[in-house]
Amino acid sequence: MENQLTKSVEERTFQYQDSLPSLPVPALEESLKKYLESVKPFANEDEYKKTEEIVQKFQEGAGKRLHQKLLERARGKRNWLEEWWLNVAYLDVRIPSQLNVNFVGPCPHFEHYWPAREGTQLERGSMMLWHNLNYWQLLRREKLPVHKSGNTPLDMNQFRMLFSTCKVPGITRDSIMNYFKTESEGHCPTHIAVLCRGRAFVFDVLHEGCLITPPELLRQLTYIHKKCSNEPVGPSIAALTSEERTRWAKAREYLISLDPENLTLLEKIQTSLFVYSIEDSSPHATPEEYSQVFEMLLGGDPSVRWGDKSYNLISFANGIFGCCCDHAPYDAMVMVNIAHYVDERVLETEGRWKGSEKVRDIPLPEELVFTVDEKILNDVSQAKAQHLKAASDLQIAASTFTSFGKKLTKEEALHPDTFIQLALQLAYYRLHGRPGCCYETAMTRYFYHGRTETVRSCTVEAVRWCQSMQDPSASLLERQQKMLEAFAKHNKMMKDCSHGKGFDRHLLGLLLIAKEEGLPVPELFEDPLFSRSGGGGNFVLSTSLVGYLRVQGVVVPMVHNGYGFFYHIRDDRFVVACSSWRSCPETDAEKLVQMIFHAFHDMIQLMNTAHL
């Protein structure tokens, strides 16, 4: 990835889009076989027998018919899932998306040239903006290298959704507005929006056809910051984006009915490249401990976040940065890519601007002054209170395991991602005394507009291994053998899922066909084992590998009694971030992370002692 980012290439970013294969529909029999295997850890014999009968009936009856209809749909679309997934996973969801759906992550610059330091916010911010805008230009010019797996190009469509993209709330379903264009496609917006102390501003990032420089960006930021510091706090319209979706949709309609100019102002935020947030708070952040950064990124002041924007770049008063992104238009790997690019530039320049200090005579930022009334101001304070109350329930444990990392697991011929997934299974098993149904993201970008598939990490093999680790009579060799079986199973599942042979999205497709056709919901989806094994968004462990770079992220748990678990892998360490809800008496993110680190040691020890 690193050299892919920086080498200059002839290939254009989006040149392979039209030649990517369509997303396949797996064989029904295969999907159902895999589904049955995945429910086994959560069933006793009688329950499993009953589910087996339900699956058999489905395969020969309703499932067969629905599968045929799904194949018909797939014949007419290059990606049969895309529109459905967007609607079901994101746009139809009514709970507040800023806290519950968005993903956040700190920028890793505090590990090197930019440790937390008061008084650095605006100057560092001007350089952050500059590097981000350079990335935007690379994308506009299609100079961003195509991601590949070996020599196979991967789908790059999600990168179109990074800039000038915004979700717009609807009464029953939201929509996504995307205004980005490459240079060859024509003009697109060239302004950014800045939120500070409840007020909103916009300014253009091009002057006479060139990007404005860090000294010029600093002048714009200083103007905004000074103005907001010396005058009363603004109406905080942005806080409405943290509301329940239908409430926000109604508040937005009302806001526009107050004054049509309000729509023009909303559209300036929607079309902006991204939103830059100037925060007054200073989260504690060291390379070893930065849980507070995550908590503030997800749960911080909603009046300086536009929750629906695909990219909020957030700056804190102590010069720490992070992002808060709407998950609907793209997956986290897009943000990982730009965050890594910016971090590399900060390293290269030692965090300083070494160019001209000249500031041209560029127009000052324009404030977006909304027409508001008592009702809107009440809606805003209700939204703020709702968001801050819900966010106070969130616990995030961000920790770094430094005893070893990828280098050692590779030496033992263990895949580092699988290593972490199995450690999580063992930790959950030890902490809760039962297996935990688990969702790990696999990417399906080999296919046209491919996004993700579910790897169900809690396998029969993983559970057998966990049991052997807790069984004092099991020998080291037996434990090691069971662990290696669990590794092999996980690696195969990950490969299958990435190549379009998962089953969760397939089952979702069959359910949605039934709904669209007005048919009864098949028994398979109403079977208690369907949800107990994670189906229908019920995974107690919602997890993802963030990558092999310095970038980290987190999302809230999928269910109230669950965990979100996100991690990245380096040669000498594993960096993890775990989320849980404080109001759930049985979960504790801190404890789970400690147990995972304990499991890392046990697993490596198992490999070492079993060699003897």
From Swiss-Prot:
Any matching Pfam family: Carn_acyltransf
Record SUPFAM superfamilies: CoA-dependent acyltransferases
Modified residues (N-acetylmethionine): 1
Keyword Nucleotide-binding: no
Chain sites annotated for binding (R)-carnitine: 439, 441, 452
EC top class, as a word: transferase
Placement of sequence motif Microbody targeting signal: 610-612
GO molecular function per UniProt: carnitine O-octanoyltransferase activity
N6-succinyllysine: residues bearing it: 40, 57, 406
Coiled-coil stretches noted in the UniProt entry, renumbered to this chain: none
Alphabetical list of Gene3D superfamilies matching this protein: Chloramphenicol acetyltransferase-like domain, Choline/Carnitine o-acyltransferase, Choline/Carnitine o-acyltransferase, domain 2
PROSITE patterns, sorted: ACYLTRANSF_C_1, ACYLTRANSF_C_2
Keyword vocabulary terms for this entry: Acetylation, Acyltransferase, Fatty acid metabolism, Lipid metabolism, Peroxisome, Transferase, Transport
EC number: 2.3.1.137
GO annotation terms (biological process): carnitine metabolic process; coenzyme A metabolic process; fatty acid beta-oxidation; fatty acid metabolic process; fatty acid transport; generation of precursor metabolites and energy; medium-chain fatty acid metabolic process
Record: residues binding CoA: 406, 410-417
Annotated catalytic residues: 327 (proton acceptor)
Principal location listed in the UniProt entry: other
Bridged cysteine pairs (disulfide): none
Subcellular localization, as worded in the UniProt entry: Peroxisome
Function statement: Beta-oxidation of fatty acids. The highest activity concerns the C6 to C10 chain length substrate.
Family designation: Belongs to the carnitine/choline acetyltransferase family.
Name of the featured protein: Peroxisomal carnitine O-octanoyltransferase
The organism of origin for this protein: Mus musculus (Mouse)
Source lineage: Eukaryota, Metazoa, Chordata, Craniata, Vertebrata
